[in-house]
Amino acid sequence: MWTGYKILIFSYLTTEIWMEKQYLSQREVDLEAYFTRNHTVLQGTRFKRAIFQGQYCRNFGCCEDRDDGCVTEFYAANALCYCDKFCDRENSDCCPDYKSFCREEKEWPPHTQPWYPEGCFKDGQHYEEGSVIKENCNSCTCSGQQWKCSQHVCLVRSELIEQVNKGDYGWTAQNYSQFWGMTLEDGFKFRLGTLPPSPMLLSMNEMTASLPATTDLPEFFVASYKWPGWTHGPLDQKNCAASWAFSTASVAADRIAIQSKGRYTANLSPQNLISCCAKNRHGCNSGSIDRAWWYLRKRGLVSHACYPLFKDQNATNNGCAMASRSDGRGKRHATKPCPNNVEKSNRIYQCSPPYRVSSNETEIMKEIMQNGPVQAIMQVREDFFHYKTGIYRHVTSTNKESEKYRKLQTHAVKLTGWGTLRGAQGQKEKFWIAANSWGKSWGENGYFRILRGVNESDIEKLIIAAWGQLTSSDEP
Ligand SMILES: *[C@@H]1O[C@H](CO)[C@@H](O)[C@H](O)[C@H]1NC(C)=O
Ligand SMILES: *[C@@H]1O[C@H](CO)[C@@H](O)[C@H](O)[C@H]1NC(C)=O
Ligand SMILES: *[C@@H]1O[C@H](CO)[C@@H](O)[C@H](O)[C@H]1NC(C)=O
Ligand SMILES: *[C@@H]1O[C@H](CO)[C@@H](O)[C@H](O)[C@H]1NC(C)=O
Ligand SMILES: *[C@@H]1O[C@H](CO)[C@@H](O)[C@H](O)[C@H]1NC(C)=O
């Protein structure tokens, strides 16, 4: 009985081999040479697959450790095959050309390559010759049965996300769909937008809050708890490099509300600044915060409701739709109705000249607690875009080629409070709470926490604030 089975199995195998030989001879592949080159490929299920010298690895190109993403349909076997270093140990589900491509590529003459008549494969799907697909920030064209991809560095990098999330850095990273598909270059070009502070700004005298030095500062402080309804949450600058305008308008709005004791609680319009602050003419193309504060002092802004953000920041008709004139008694009035005609109030809000707050942590805390949120100029690096939750500190990429993945640029945000947390090792970790301008889906509801007291990402280097210009008639 057992012998009978053996004969059956044997004859089955011989038929299989014979059929494969027939098949291959039709395709003019030198089976003989392949067999003598390495006999180990003759073992078990490997045999059947090994004789198909397909395009898998050539097209998908991954020969690293087990990579579940690097899988493709193996047509002949109606199965999935992998193309990665795991195949060194476990061969049953490896792409047929794993060895030839990843281990012995040079020995293969180019004429053995064509197997599929035309086109390329990706995730088990066939694409015509000349097809273009997008892979994150790169586009790949199927040409000569291979995907040829552009080599941009992408803003979202899974290795970096993984590195942050596996490490003990105090924060976690996420893949944001709004950044997926952008190059690193474009991320820095479109999502930040504050010019490095001018020497004039940096040489400003530092003011210290008038609170006595001995004031007890709480462990935890959030501006929106102390002044509910008077402070303003993060907006989304989208692909408009204008953090210079978003942070300035937001700090000014909070401070006018606090100073007027809730009489004027409108958020101020960053679009008004972007479109009308003429010296920053390329509003979505970065600007300086000195000019923003100058504009708030000299011209004033209407509310965000009156002059909302344009849907398409790249629209060419992005001209200034608001003007103000002086009434001769130190107040300015709008000369045009609101661009958003549903909003009737086109009141102009103005500020005092800005002042610099000391970089001393305690001084910054006193200033926020006494007068409201402040503007902070920070240096943003590539990992910051991935921030999801926790206390941010810069994580240096461990990638060997990390130079090309690194970038650094100035950004402006709003500090709204602080706190203390016990770290994983039980140590005390102090943080600032800051509002970014990347919408509420980013970070902690649009906010982030960042290490406090160690000048992380230069967050304490330049702190700016201003007073609202309220006349006696404005006083509540
Ligand atoms: C065949 O491949 C195995 C595993 O890749 C290798 O260890 C062996 O040296 C190869 N033999 C020949 C003759 O190339
Ligand atoms: C990241 O998100 C995008 C869009 O939401 C998605 O298409 C992509 O597969 C994700 N990438 C990773 C590595 O998770
Ligand atoms: C905006 O327009 C410029 C020039 O026309 C272009 O280079 C850029 O990619 C556009 N940005 C977006 C986000 O569409
Ligand atoms: C910061 O200012 C406080 C007083 O407000 C002072 O006690 C402290 O030493 C200063 N810290 C530094 C680093 O200068
Ligand atoms: C913060 O760091 C920057 C750059 O390292 C430095 O220029 C600046 O003086 C530092 N500021 C403080 C307050 O330590």
UniProtKB/Swiss-Prot annotation:
Any Pfam family hit: Peptidase_C1
Domain SMB as annotated: residue spans: 59-107
Name the Gene Ontology molecular function terms of this record: cysteine-type endopeptidase activity; nucleotide binding
* List of glycosylated residues: 38, 175, 314, 360, 455
**Chain positions of site Cleavage:** 49-50
Q: Where in the cell is it found?
A: Secreted, Extracellular space, Extracellular matrix, Basement membrane
Q: In which tissues is it expressed?
A: Expressed in the kidney cortex, small intestine and cornea.
InterPro entries, A to Z: Papain-like_cys_pep_sf (IPR038765), Pept_asp_AS (IPR025661), Peptidase_C1A (IPR013128), Peptidase_C1A_C (IPR000668), Somatomedin_B_dom (IPR001212)
- Keywords from the UniProt entry: Basement membrane, Cell adhesion, Disulfide bond, Extracellular matrix, Glycoprotein, Secreted
Under CDD domains, the record lists:
Peptidase_C1A_CathepsinB
Keyword Disulfide bond in record: yes
Q: Could you tell me the Gene Ontology terms of the biological process aspect for this record?
A: cell adhesion; proteolysis
Question: What are the GO cellular component annotations?
Answer: basement membrane; extracellular space; lysosome
Q: Spell out the disulfide connections.
A: 63-70, 70-102, 81-83, 81-95, 87-94, 95-102
Q: How is it modified after translation?
A: It has been suggested that the active SMB domain may be permitted considerable disulfide bond heterogeneity or variability, thus 2 alternate disulfide patterns based on 3D structures are described with 1 disulfide bond conserved in both.
What family does the Swiss-Prot or TrEMBL record give for this protein?
Belongs to the peptidase C1 family.
Another remark in the UniProt entry says: Antibodies against TINAG are found in sera of patients with tubulointerstitial nephritis, a rare autoimmune disorder that causes acute and chronic renal injury.
Primary role? Mediates adhesion of proximal tubule epithelial cells via integrins alpha3-beta1 and alphaV-beta3. This is a non catalytic peptidase C1 family protein.
**Stated name of the protein:** Tubulointerstitial nephritis antigen
Q: Name its species.
A: Homo sapiens (Human)
What's the encoding gene here?
TINAG
